[in-house]
Amino acid sequence: MAAVDSDIEPLPRGGFRCCLCHITTANQPSLDAHLGGRKHRHLVELRATRKAQGLRSVFVSGFPRDVDSTQLSEYFQAFGPVASVVMDKDKGVFAIVEMGDLGAREAVLSQPQHSLGGRRLRVRPREQIEFQSPASRSPKRVAPDSHQLIKALAEAPDVEAQMVKLVGLRELSEAERQLRSLVVALMQEVFAEFFPGCVVHPFGSSINSFDVHGCDLDLFLDLGDLDEPQPAPKAPESPSLDSALASPLDPQALACTPASPPDSQPPASPQDSEALDFEAPSSSLAPRTPDSALASETLASPRSLPPASPLQEDQGDGDQGKAVELAEALKGEKAEGGAMLELVGSILRGCVPGVYRVQTVPSARCPVVKFCHRPSGLHGDISLSNRLALHNSRFLSLCSELDGRVRPLVYTLRCWAQGRGLSGSGPLLNNYALTLLVIYFLQTRDPPVLPTVSQLTQKAGEQVEVDGWDCSFPRDASRLEPSTNKEPLSSLLAQFFSCVSCWDLRGSLLSLREGQALSVAGGLPSNLSEGLRLGPMNLQDPFDLSHNVAANVTSRVAGRLQNCCRAAANYCRSLQYQRRSSRGRDWGLLPLLQPSSPSSILSATPIPLPPASFTQLTAVLAQVLREALGCHIEQGTKRLRSEGGGPGEPPQGGTSKRAKLDGQKKSCEEGPEEQQGCAGEHGEDGVEEMVIEVGESVQDWVMRSPGQLGELPLMTGKHLATREEGQSGTAALAKQGPRGPEAACEGSQAEAEKRVSLTVSWRCALWHRVWQGRRRARRRLQQQIKEGGGSGAGSGAEWLATEAQVTRELRGLSSTEQRPEAEPLLTFVASTSQADQSLTVTPLQDSQGLFPDLHHFLQVFLPQALRNLLK
């Protein structure tokens, strides 16, 4: 119990943090459930096992270099049973011997002198290191709030300077780039011994100009034609670069070591030679840029890396011979992918100094061999059939060379997406997809910032085809005309948020080759979409036209992306974004880059609703919230609202002003800025919101509206200021602008009706945790009804009555009792939109941190409730 107490840290407002698992729980029941869960119990057992192993182990050094683990085991067995022996594989200067019990360890330590092979051994107790739980596999969202970052960005004169400064804080230093070049050269030297003529190409973030501290090292091993006769492979000598990589970022070693082995083979073609996008390190190194708090991973030193297990350390002993045997077996015949991956893995384990944790992943979309390099602290992977990714990396590098605004914009948006929980693995956007989204956006500006891939192909000169796909584009950016678009970075960032918030991600295909959105409904051209898998978000690879790089993104993540972009676009219209604060407040990029809390991330996550007419949905939703869950729904008044807001939350301090609208129709002749629905202008446009009293139909309000739909003001979006009183129970009726900048203003009423979007919102208050223990209470009530001879909830009315009774039991109140006068436990705004048939829930007051639990309950309960009442 004492160990459990030391792992748990109480938090304000009744929460708890488990320091062992690095998670936070909202209340005591959630904590109890976590402590009894499999993850926590596994880590507790693992910690106890590691501690017991440490208490039974001794540290041994001073033995001859030719002594192996078997000889050490035989020697120490004279004092008692030996559980394992872990050797220092790289240097062979020490070993950790784990005895079978504490008595054997004490016998070893009580011996005054040990000797083996004529050498005196130094034996001492193993140092006890504090247990650290394995790194979480969830996407890391490191808060960009370090003192260095805040100071650097706050002191910048404007937003553009902040974005440029952000690049300098996140990108790799010159020393880090040279270190990666040395690792690539080391790999080239080793693999050339087994596969003469092969070339190791770096790709991905290491060469695409969007690198960050700690990014992985992606390598493509180009083996050429394996059908050609190959000389017999031999075990390579110790690479000459091993000494240079003995200690990470050693200036002397880096300065005196060539970037590529002198006997390495030249690239097979001029195109391949451009992949080695680095020069030999000079004799003087630029000072290393300090790691930023924005980095998703940090460059680890050998000391900070976790020790390898005995199994991992011992695996390398026979891998060198195994690699030679596999290479002999595969010589003269075309190897299958799995066997070749195993061969590459064996070479890494047995022949590359400092490499550990080698793992082959043949089931990936592109089979790879993952590895870690201990001296440099780098994580990487090697692929054998990913030549297309090499050209993708060169294309991204070309885009960054064509316009200096590309890198600051990509770095800023990657950091913003990371803080919002939009980028990562699983159903989230990966960095490659997010970068392509930015490039597509820049292609669609007027005038364009970047050319389309088709335009680049026409100017390529030489045609390059990879796996049947046309990968032709100029390699030299100086051969292309610069863009005539001179918009500042701050404006482009605001326009990006505004555009993405109104793009039809599901109904269109964003094509970088054509530089436009292709409608999915009308059918896509076969030459542009054959084999393409469509989904909630469709973003086409620039070369592999059958690959949707956002195919993994779910509808929930796509909806959250647009909601976050809408909130960010609202913030970019405020003075807080445009001007430096004279009061020392966060301004410009800082509010955008602050990581979202779990509640704000959930509030941007839409809850999908079953198909039904919007009028039915709103009526049934209000009924479920009020009767089934016991929410008190407050009524509001008619209001005029501006689009001001904050990045994910309403602004504090009144930085946005409300603008009154005259309701008159805007003319199409006002200029191109007004015609572009996602131009991102910093205007004072507003949205007129009309209150619908509880029980009043949205359709009735539309029928009684004094103006025609075509007379409503032309708007680009809407925003609900949730912290204002009296805005609940409202329906926002806004005529949205065209979907893209190329759309023209249509004056007909039919077109205006298509652009009308209805949004109904309720301000709800809860005094009791009606979601906690609900299933148990429902089963108990159903059992009572069954014992009394009643029937189950068959119709929608019976189901609603049952749920209302469950709520009353959970509240401990009678059906006639009024709500108490005390402050509510939780208040929130529930808002449903006709455009996407979904519900968003935004917390207003949540002093106890209960909103995540409520949102999780509503995700399951509300869709099922609506299906029961609408059937």
Swiss-Prot record:
> What does the entry's cofactor note say about binding and number?
Binds 1 divalent cation per subunit.
Report activity regulation. Answer: Adenylyltransferase activity is specifically phosphatidylinositol 4,5-bisphosphate (PtdIns(4,5)P2).
Q: CDD domains per the record?
A: NT_PAP_TUTase, RRM_TUT1
Q: What is its EC number?
A: 2.7.7.19, 2.7.7.52
Q: Where is the PAP-associated domain?
A: 489-547
List the residue ranges of the region (Disordered): 252-321, 636-684
Identify the residues that bind UTP.
216, 218, 392, 414, 432, 547
Question: Pfam families in the record, alphabetically?
Answer: MTPAP-like_central, PAP_assoc, RRM_1, zf-met
The Gene Ontology CC terms held by the record are: mRNA cleavage and polyadenylation specificity factor complex; nuclear speck; nucleolus
Composition bias of kind Basic and acidic residues appears in 659-669
- The Phosphoserine modification is found at 748
SUPFAM superfamilies (alphabetical): beta-beta-alpha zinc fingers, Nucleotidyltransferase, PAP/OAS1 substrate-binding domain, RNA-binding domain, RBD
Record keyword Transferase present: yes
UniProt record, GO biological process: co-transcriptional mRNA 3'-end processing, cleavage and polyadenylation pathway; RNA 3'-end processing; snRNA processing; U6 snRNA 3'-end processing
Q: What class of enzyme is it?
A: transferase
Task: Cite the binding residues for ATP.
Answer: 205, 392
Write out the biased-composition intervals (Pro residues). Answer: 259-269
Quote the PROSITE patterns the UniProt record gives: RRM
Please give the subunit comment from the record.
Answer: Associates with the cleavage and polyadenylation specificity factor (CPSF) complex. Interacts with CPSF1 and CPSF3; the interaction is direct. Interacts with PIP5K1A.
Q: What job does the chain carry out? A: Poly(A) polymerase that creates the 3'-poly(A) tail of specific pre-mRNAs. Localizes to nuclear speckles together with PIP5K1A and mediates polyadenylation of a select set of mRNAs, such as HMOX1. In addition to polyadenylation, it is also required for the 3'-end cleavage of pre-mRNAs: binds to the 3'UTR of targeted pre-mRNAs and promotes the recruitment and assembly of the CPSF complex on the 3'UTR of pre-mRNAs. In addition to adenylyltransferase activity, also has uridylyltransferase activity.
Q: Which PANTHER family match?
A: POLY A POLYMERASE CID PAP -RELATED, SPECKLE TARGETED PIP5K1A-REGULATED POLY(A) POLYMERASE
What remark about domains does the record contain? The zinc-finger domain is required for terminal uridylyltransferase activity. Together with the RRM domain, binds the 5'-area of U6 snRNA.
Give the protein name, as stated in the record.
Answer: Speckle targeted PIP5K1A-regulated poly(A) polymerase
What species is this protein from?
Answer: Bos taurus (Bovine)
